[in-house]
Amino acid sequence: GTGKELVARAIGLSRFIPYEEKTGRFASDFLAAFHPINLSALSETLLESELFGHAKGAFTGALQNRKGYFETCGMHGSVFLDEITETKPEAQVKLLRVLQTRRFQRLGEVQPTRFEGKVIAATNRDLAEEMKAGRFREDFYYRLCANRITTPSLDEILRDSPGELKHLVEFVAGRVAGLDEASALADETCDWINRKLGSDYTWPGNFRELQQCVRNILIHR
């Protein structure tokens, strides 16, 4: 709700201009791969299959070889591990090893594959508390957190900069109704928010709640 994936995409989908040795030119346009995965929605086996890939017959239902996200993201790509604190310590050990060695193995295979991309992780929990409770490994934390970004809640943003509401609503309106309708829809939404919710509203649903406000105004126009 605070826009963790938007921040991750902004980092992961950075444009590069790689040099192509075969042609002796720089690529005219290159967009890095971005693979988001919600760790709270997957079992341990399925998580390993999604990230590492698997060989045919590695487990029941593995009918063919499959590349995982660590392999398909390529040299400039990113794997976004959302809700990283939902992983069990056993899975954290395996992910730690990938970060340390830059290598992994598909399920059912012995030959290691090199990981050349980057890992971006996110959580809405207090990592210090998770480590203190023994649910999150300290060694994994220090290997993972090379750079840390805290995404503020919508309430924090608007308390610091009340004028940002119109800008954020216009952004959401553009995505919901298109650029041609964005300005008018944003004006209607801001007017409704000021009349019905007031300037002291704390937005417990964060950006998802703001998006729903814009959609409701669009539906009832």
Whereabouts are the PLM-identified features?
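Conserved AAA+/SF3 P-loop NTPase catalytic/coupling segment centered on the Walker-B
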Residues: 4-10, 41-53, 63-102, 117-121, ...
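Nucleotide-binding/hydrolysis machinery
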Residues: 10, 29-32, 90, 108-118, ...
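Conserved amphipathic alpha-helical interaction elements at protein-protein interfaces in regulatory
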Residues: 13-17, 48, 57, 61, ...
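Nucleotide second-messenger and two-component phosphorelay signaling modules
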Residues: 17-31, 63-66, 76, 106-112
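Short glycine/serine/threonine-enriched helix-capping/active-site loop
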Residues: 37, 122, 149
